[in-house]
Curated annotation (Swiss-Prot):
Molecular functions per Gene Ontology: nucleotide binding
Domain of life: Bacteria
Keywords from the named record: Nucleotide-binding
Protein's recorded name: Nucleotide-binding protein Adeh_0094
Family statement drawn from the similarity comment of this UniProt entry: Belongs to the YajQ family.
InterPro entries, per database record: DUF520, UPF0234-like_C, UPF0234_N, YajQ-like_sf
UniProt-listed CDD domains: YajQ_like
SUPFAM superfamilies membership: YajQ-like (SSF89963)
Organism: Anaeromyxobacter dehalogenans (strain 2CP-C)
Amino acid sequence: MPSFDVVSEVDLMEVENAFNQARKEIAQRFDFKGTHTELERDKEQNVLIRAGSEGRAEAALQVLMEKLAKRGVALESLDPQKLEPASGGHVRQLVKLKRGLKVEDARKIVAKVKESGIKVQAAIQGEAVRVTGKKRDDLQAAIHAIRAAGFPIPLQFQNFRE
């Protein structure tokens, strides 16, 4: 029976490349000179922006988002937190990376597939939703229904099997 998986993943190599490009651009750009603006990464692949002012932090976030978009990383996978004051009159902002399909989102996807009326079954399997059906056309209709729902997270469709 044909099936596919709905997942929400981020290519960490592309994130790493975009992060390095953004860091390099911030170090070389004239308007960032002397502003003590820097980007750091932690073990969870989150990005920490440190800057001398709110405007520089927002500009650094824009540079990072631009580089991620050019590398093909969905910007919906970013979760920028609020700007918070740091020592020495600086500000910092944590930008979290959304990875994996949360249970609430998986339930919404299953509900959307069921309410579409297509003859397929959707089941939650860990951090993925497996959709199975008798015909390939039904699965493609399910993919279109999920995309049309406009979920606020980046979704990929993998393991399309006959």
